[in-house]
Amino acid sequence: MRVKGGTVTRARRKKWLKLAKGYFGHKSIGYKVAKQAVVKSWTYAFRDRKQIKREFRKLWIARINAATRAEGLSYSKFINGLKRANVTINRKMLSELAISEPKTFAMLIKIARDAK
């Protein structure tokens, strides 16, 4: 007896269309285009999980740089001074301090300047 794969095929296509729900135009309706769109979205998601880490680090460095230049010191000299003074605060915390607690950040700048 011949077995047709209708139920299996329908289930497989339904799975891909469910993943493409909310996509614009034919990407949410057509099976082939929907599958391609979902696979592409997974590619972007994988790439951007790595990129977001770089983007945030760039943001923190820009914030620290702006705060240190306001005090008359460059970012690189500030970070070098902190390393010489054995101050181990990561860039995320430094940027938060620069925004929320400028007095504490000014003390860190003084420590970095005095480090030899």
From Swiss-Prot:
InterPro entries: Ribosomal_bL20, RIBOSOMAL_L20_CS, Ribosomal_protein_bL20_C. Disulfide bonds: none annotated. GO terms for molecular function: rRNA binding; structural constituent of ribosome. Pfam families: Ribosomal_L20. It comes from the Bacteria. Keywords: Ribonucleoprotein, Ribosomal protein, RNA-binding, rRNA-binding. The keyword RNA-binding applies. Signal peptide: none annotated. One of its GO terms (cellular component) is ribosome. One of its GO terms (biological process) is ribosomal large subunit assembly. Binds directly to 23S ribosomal RNA and is necessary for the in vitro assembly process of the 50S ribosomal subunit. It is not involved in the protein synthesizing functions of that subunit. Belongs to the bacterial ribosomal protein bL20 family. This is Large ribosomal subunit protein bL20. The gene is rplT.
